[in-house]
């Protein structure tokens, strides 16, 4: 297409309120994120009702800041992209209703975006020349997916968690060893001081050894049992060793399955996405194992790994180019699956 397509994107699926202006799916003019971490920290996790109320408070300001930083006005926008699932229903509704109101008032197309597709699309921002096909590992607090991206907007789910998401397991273990919220970065930090081989925590074993699914509930239970036994015996607990050993089990599972997926699909490229993609151990292990297996491993910069609207703007662009827009009847779908519309 001759004309640049400017998309105003909005993300409010959990506890970040974000707005961004993205051009042609890959160029970010602005990406404003208002985080609620400090608010939810005292509760030990995200409180949905509190998150929704905070989204309502800040969304107008966040959108205005995104336009100001991009040095454009509403009349320069060509379309509105917005997350409509998966996520917390109350949080999703705030961003969705705001986007629908803008779409109606400005008479601009509305493009509903799957949050998981947004995470995958963060790699198109980071790597301007990236094109399908490739394998993508989406790993965050609420989701763990192993996906084969055949073409823009076309996904085949190769594996997913059967219980806890990887990031959810991190949060629970962080809480158990007294590190607080958010758990992922804190476990990652303290793990650097520990011995990853100190404790042998088991990985899930499936009867079907061909599956690329994940399971972290057994690992989580094993860590909790270890901590309980130590506590009952009144023995000292080396938090760094626990964190490092737990992290090694999680990371090796994620990396091994991802490399197996590449062999299955005969591709040599893995894109990693989602909040856990910022994890230093995951990045280092992928870099090492990718090199050994002659597989290119791509990571977005950390700001694009967290929930943000720039990734939603990128995904919205590729949906729009495939002829997909949404009506003003679009509703929030908290349990939206990858590939569903």
UniProtKB/Swiss-Prot annotation:
Swiss-Prot/TrEMBL catalytic activity: L-threonylcarbamoyladenylate + adenosine(37) in tRNA = N(6)-L-threonylcarbamoyladenosine(37) in tRNA + AMP + H(+)
Pfam families cross-referenced by the UniProt entry: TsaD
Keywords annotated in UniProt: Acyltransferase, Cytoplasm, Iron, Metal-binding, Transferase, tRNA processing
Cofactor requirements of the protein: Fe(2+)
Broad EC category: transferase
Main location: cytoplasm
Binding positions (substrate): 138-142, 171, 184, 188, 279
InterPro entries in UniProt: ATPase_NBD, Gcp-like_dom, KAE1/TsaD, Peptidase_M22_CS, TsaD
Any single biological process term in GO: tRNA threonylcarbamoyladenosine modification
Textual note on the cofactor: Binds 1 Fe(2+) ion per subunit.
One Gene Ontology CC term in the entry: cytoplasm
Annotated localization: Cytoplasm
Organism superkingdom: Bacteria
Record has Chloroplast as a keyword: no
Keyword tRNA processing: yes
Record-listed E.C. numbers: 2.3.1.234
SUPFAM superfamilies: Actin-like ATPase domain
Residue sites binding Fe cation per the record: 115, 119, 307
GO function terms (MF aspect): iron ion binding; N(6)-L-threonylcarbamoyladenine synthase activity
Family as reported in the entry's similarity comment: Belongs to the KAE1 / TsaD family.
Described function: Required for the formation of a threonylcarbamoyl group on adenosine at position 37 (t(6)A37) in tRNAs that read codons beginning with adenine. Is involved in the transfer of the threonylcarbamoyl moiety of threonylcarbamoyl-AMP (TC-AMP) to the N6 group of A37, together with TsaE and TsaB. TsaD likely plays a direct catalytic role in this reaction.
Protein name, UniProt field: tRNA N6-adenosine threonylcarbamoyltransferase
């Amino acid at each position: 297409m001759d004309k640049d397509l400017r998309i105003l994107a909005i993300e409010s699926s959990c506890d970040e309120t974000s707005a961004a202006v993205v051009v042609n799916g890959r160029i970010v003019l602005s990406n404003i994120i208002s985080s609620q971490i400090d608010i939810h920290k005292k509760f030990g996790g995200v409180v949905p009702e509190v998150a929704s109320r905070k989204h309502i408070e800040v969304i107008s300001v966040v959108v205005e800041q995104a336009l100001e930083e991009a040095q454009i006005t509403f009349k320069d926008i060509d379309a509105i992209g917005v997350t409509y699932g998966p996520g917390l229903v109350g949080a999703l509704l705030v961003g969705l209703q705001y986007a629908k109101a803008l779409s109606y008032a400005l008479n601009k197309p509305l493009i509903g975006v799957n949050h998981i597709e947004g995470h995958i699309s963060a790699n198109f921002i980071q790597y301007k020349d990236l094109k399908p096909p490739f394998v993508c590992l989406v790993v965050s607090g609420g989701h763990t997916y192993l996906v084969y991206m055949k073409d823009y907007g076309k996904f085949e789910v190769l594996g997913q968690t059967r219980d806890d998401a990887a990031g959810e397991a991190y949060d629970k273990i962080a809480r158990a060893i007294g590190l607080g919220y958010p758990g992922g970065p804190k476990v990652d930090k303290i793990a650097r001081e520990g011995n990853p081989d100190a404790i042998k925590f088991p990985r899930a074993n499936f009867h079907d050894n061909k599956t690329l699914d994940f399971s972290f509930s057994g690992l989580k239970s094993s860590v909790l049992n270890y901590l309980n036994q130590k506590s009952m015996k009144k023995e000292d607990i080396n938090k760094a060793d626990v964190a490092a050993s737990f992290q090694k089990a999680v990371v090796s599972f994620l990396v091994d399955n991802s490399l197996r997926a590449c062999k299955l699909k005969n591709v040599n490229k893995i894109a990693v996405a989602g909040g856990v993609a910022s994890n230093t151990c995951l990045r280092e292990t992928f870099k090492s194992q990718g090199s050994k297996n002659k597989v290119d491993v791509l990571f977005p910069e950390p700001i694009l790994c967290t929930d943000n609207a720039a990734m939603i703007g990128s995904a919205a662009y590729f949906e729009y180019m495939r002829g997909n827009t949404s009506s003003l009847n679009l509703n929030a779908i908290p349990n939206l699956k990858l590939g569903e519309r």
